[in-house]
Amino acid sequence: MNTSLRRVAVAIMVLIVLLLANATVTQVFAADGLRADPRNQRVLLDEYSRQRGQITAGGQLLAYSVSTDGRFRYLRVYPNPQAYAPVTGFYSLGYSSTGLERAEDAVLNGSDERLFGRRLADFFTGRDPRGGNVDTTIKPQVQQAAWDAMQNGCDGPCRGSVVALEPSTGKILAMVSAPSYDPNLLATHDLAAQADAWEKLRDDPQSPLLNRAISETYPPGSTFKVITTAAALQAGARPQTQLTSAPRTPLPDSTATLENFGGAPCGPGPTVSLQEAFAKSCNTAFVELGLSTGTDKLKAMAQAFGLDTPPPAIPLQVAESTTGPIVDAAALGMSSIGQRDVALTPLQNAQVAATIANDGIAMRPYLVESLKGPDLATISTTTPEQERRAVSPQVAATLTDLMVAAEQVTQQKGAIAGVQIASKTGTAEHGTDPRNTPPHAWYIAFAPAQDPKVAVAVLVEDGGDRLSATGGALAAPIGRATIAAALREGS
């Protein structure tokens, strides 16, 4: 072989090596990035060529796909968008996915390994591939009642969240976040309309894309007194334990004072029982109770209820609830009434109520009842799982009695005839100027008190006037409407 031919052969070999190296880099090392690149139309065309599975609740369709004549073969449809957006999320050409559309994507698009047999059968038979289905724990009647109550609970729409749980299992019966949005606007194949909708939602100061039920934490206010009371009871306090009834009290190690709602004393005498202080939600009494219980016991009890612990996915990701740092006696006093750095998601506060309702046992919350193949054959079912025992049955029973008494002195708008409810309200200051910022209104409850079927947490953000925007006035009627729907569903 002469020199020229050798040079040509070497050049060809070098080119082949370079081509193989480039193919290796592209197919092995860069494959994931290329697949995830939103500019990769082949991936999108492949995904939209398959009929994505359904998301359902109690037989009701929450999300499904319909055939189109366009370049992208299937279009995602959400028939009741606003009420269920926090559950389904969206599936979008330009903005990826959220909610169950994201968490259960492998099942919905058919790529889950448990659907391999179906994919193989489709390949040999020539059937069009289809995704699997997700059946949620949501009860449509409960979800709709909670959504409707939020839309009409504040002389118009409220901003906030409602979560309802089945105490004995941890099933999420309702998960509402308001204001909400229409996922159909982000699922459209009209990319210009999709981008316009995204920009409006992203820039909306009301944050409709935020799932307030699980992605945001809030000061719980007086609803946290349930945990403070649990810690005190476990440490030896009793419902008859006497506490101060003073209208205001100085916070130790500080120049600040803390007062009861409206600046009123808790009772006619110098002291008041824990039972009466709980029912009237007396701040000064609970500062004393928290200080006498101590930081370690309060934080340990909060952790037993699920705070300061990474929460399990439901399968959506949930923000961690926390007591925050309690660095001194003043911080302990404020934390004991659910202020300072204490912050909970509405889901976590619903779990607090559900744990008491379940004799002190905390159940792992979950949103997916079962996963099914395209032929509706079940591929997995969620089994209820105990997370921990938070309090003894005796402490849970005492807390139930205290919460029943508290419900009886709460404003009774929306009361359910013949149903005994155990509850605790809360009015939580927040923001950089809490004295001049409308407080959040809370309500946590379960019913029937002696045979609980449902536990709820209601949060109304920035409820209004400081003296009228209380948990009892705003949040409680929403909670009772949700409870009533759950009890009708179960009857």
UniProtKB/Swiss-Prot annotation:
> Gene name on record?
pbpA
The annotated pathway is: Cell wall biogenesis; peptidoglycan biosynthesis
This one is known as Peptidoglycan D,D-transpeptidase PbpA
Q: Which UniProt keywords apply?
A: Cell inner membrane, Cell membrane, Cell shape, Cell wall biogenesis/degradation, Hydrolase, Membrane, Peptidoglycan synthesis, Signal-anchor, Transmembrane, Transmembrane helix
Chief site of localization: membrane
Compartments, record wording: Cell inner membrane
Q: Which residues lie on this side of the membrane: Periplasmic?
A: 30-491
Q: From its record, what is one biological process in GO terms?
A: regulation of cell shape
Top-rank taxon: Bacteria
According to the UniProt record, one GO cellular component term is: plasma membrane
Look up the EC number in the record and give it. Answer: 3.4.16.4
Q: Which residues form the active site?
A: 222
Question: Which species?
Answer: Mycolicibacterium smegmatis (strain ATCC 700084 / mc(2)155) (Mycobacterium smegmatis)
Q: Which residue positions does the secretion signal occupy?
A: none
User: Residue ranges, Cytoplasmic compartment?
Assistant: 1-8
The record's similarity note reads:
Belongs to the transpeptidase family.
The family database entries (Pfam families) matched by this protein are listed as: PBP_dimer_2 (PF21922), Transpeptidase (PF00905)
